[in-house]
């Protein structure tokens, strides 16, 4: 005889919207913040993190996307631009992107773990595509459009990082897939206001 189903209780916590400010009320941080940055749209920010510290990236309004890079500080000081490598990560984790649990780490091209995923309230990201580039917009007819790769180039100059036409970033909250016809599809992000990814740094970054 088949086992009867067990009861399942579902709790839904909706995001709170402040009518006065016309903004969503963000959840409390999981830890006392050492550093807090609000990254405005079409911009990039840099910050430094020590091994063992946490990085919480929050989608403040829902259905927003964010490109993420992380460099090994020690290697960068030695003139080696070692950052998260999506191909190495997919190879070692055996999945499209890491998730909390056993297969949770992002690796660099030297096969060293850089960060690990501790918590992820969305579970849908992209590691196959560049951060948006000038060519991406030019192909659509938008010449000179602000793009993520050039934003990265601008803010990384102070670390003497060489500019690139396209960055192999971790594209957080992007909803991409490869369909049965081998076509890359892009759809609306699944993230809601207040959704986040929590990383732990495995190196000084």
Regions found by a protein language model. Give the residues of each.
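Acidic, Ser/Thr/Pro
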Residues: 1-205
């Amino acid at each position: 005889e088949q086992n009867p189903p067990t009861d399942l209780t579902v709790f839904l916590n909706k995001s709170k919207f402040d009518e006065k400010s016309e903004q969503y009320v963000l959840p409390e941080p999981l830890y006392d913040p050492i550093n807090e940055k609000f990254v405005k749209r079409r911009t990039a920010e840099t910050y430094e993190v020590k091994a063992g510290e946490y990085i919480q990236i929050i989608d403040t309004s829902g259905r927003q996307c964010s490109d993420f890079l992380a460099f090994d500080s020690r290697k960068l000081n030695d003139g080696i631009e070692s950052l998260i490598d999506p191909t190495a990560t997919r190879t070692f984790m055996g999945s499209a992107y890491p998730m909390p649990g056993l297969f949770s780490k992002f690796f660099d091209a030297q096969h060293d773990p850089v960060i690990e995923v501790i918590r992820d309230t969305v579970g849908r990201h992209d590691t196959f595509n560049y951060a948006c580039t000038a060519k991406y917009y030019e192909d659509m007819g938008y010449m000179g459009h602000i793009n993520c790769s050039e934003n990265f180039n601008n803010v990384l100059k102070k670390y003497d990082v060489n500019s690139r036409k396209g960055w192999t970033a971790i594209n957080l909250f992007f909803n991409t897939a490869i369909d049965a016809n081998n076509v890359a599809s892009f759809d609306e992000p699944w993230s809601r206001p207040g959704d986040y990814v929590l990383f732990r740094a495995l190196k000084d970054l």
